[in-house]
């Protein structure tokens, strides 16, 4: 397969980074290059798919195909090619308004690239999924509650779980109370979108970076497994959920102005 890669690169007059080699004389033969690079790629060489993604965008290539180019790029990314992962992530983010869940796919690829040391991916993630700063609306009071917290976990386990999510993923009050737990878990991130039930809700992502965060989310998802998270479910509408939260915070002695901080 290495020989196939080298042969394909030779015909393309390119290096493994997809750059044109000025030291190679003669015109490129992209058709032959595609043949050999495809064979190398099908045997698991990510570099072959990455170079193919470059060839298919060449205006001088008679079989130029932007869709095929992106398909090759994704195959390279799937095989762990960091530059391809970065490029897939940025492409998905640019197209987030045209394709459903493109922001989720963008975060996935950028996390993969970041794990391989990409500073560009890390910077992009900071813009795409910044850590929320919801302020203190009472979610931290439960940590010092002791016996009342244990009582809440017994009497209102769903509310207790939502407070736990709020602390770990910096959720606002409205996000914590209205989050669709089933749809939020995307594996690598939490998709927070309460816009359908809250006028000020904005879609955003919270990255899952640690094993502890993953473990907590798994526990919460299991708890909500057979629960309808919608307003017709057992938790009721936003006002009903908010009332239960306020009653609990009042028991803890949380100042009323804290309860009414903007959600």
Which ranges hold each PLM region?
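Short helix-capping/linker turns of helical repeat alpha-solenoids
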Residues: 1-2, 7, 11-14, 18-19, ...
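Structural signature of tandem alpha-helical TPR/SEL1-like repeats
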Residues: 18-36, 62-72, 99-109
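Active-site/catalytic core of tyrosine-dependent DNA strand-transfer enzymes
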Residues: 209-263
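Short, charged phosphate-coordinating catalytic segments
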Residues: 164-188
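TPR/TPR-like alpha-solenoid helical repeat scaffolds
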Residues: 87-91, 120-136
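Basic, Lys/Arg- and aromatic-enriched nucleic-acid-binding interface segment
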Residues: 133-169
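Conserved tyrosine-mediated DNA breakage-rejoining catalytic core shared by Y-recombinases
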Residues: 179-216
């Amino acid at each position: 397969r290495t020989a196939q890669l080298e042969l394909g690169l030779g015909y393309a007059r390119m290096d493994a980074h997809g750059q044109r080699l000025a030291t190679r004389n003669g015109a490129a033969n992209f058709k032959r290059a595609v043949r050999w690079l495809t064979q190398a790629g099908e045997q698991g060489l990510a570099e072959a798919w990455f170079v193919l993604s470059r060839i298919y965008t060449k205006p001088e290539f008679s079989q130029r195909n932007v869709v095929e180019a992106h398909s090759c790029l994704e195959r390279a990314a799937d095989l762990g090619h960091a530059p391809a992962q970065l490029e897939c992530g940025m492409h998905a983010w640019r197209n987030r308004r045209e394709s459903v869940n493109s922001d989720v796919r963008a975060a996935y690829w950028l996390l993969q690239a970041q794990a391989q040391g990409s500073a560009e991916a890390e910077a992009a993630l900071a813009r795409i999924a910044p850590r929320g700063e919801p302020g203190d609306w009472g979610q931290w009071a439960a940590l010092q509650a002791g016996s009342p917290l244990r009582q809440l976990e017994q009497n209102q386990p769903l509310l207790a779980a939502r407070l736990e999510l709020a602390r770990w993923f910096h959720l606002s009050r409205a996000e914590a109370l209205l989050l669709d737990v089933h749809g939020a878990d995307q594996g690598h991130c939490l998709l927070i979108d309460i816009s359908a039930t809250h006028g000020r809700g904005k879609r955003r992502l919270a990255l899952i970076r640690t094993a502890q965060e993953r473990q907590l989310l798994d526990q919460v998802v299991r708890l909500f497994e057979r629960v309808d998270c919608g307003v017709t479910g057992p938790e009721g509408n936003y006002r009903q959920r908010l009332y239960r939260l306020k009653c609990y915070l009042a028991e803890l002695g949380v100042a009323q102005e804290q309860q009414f901080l903007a959600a």
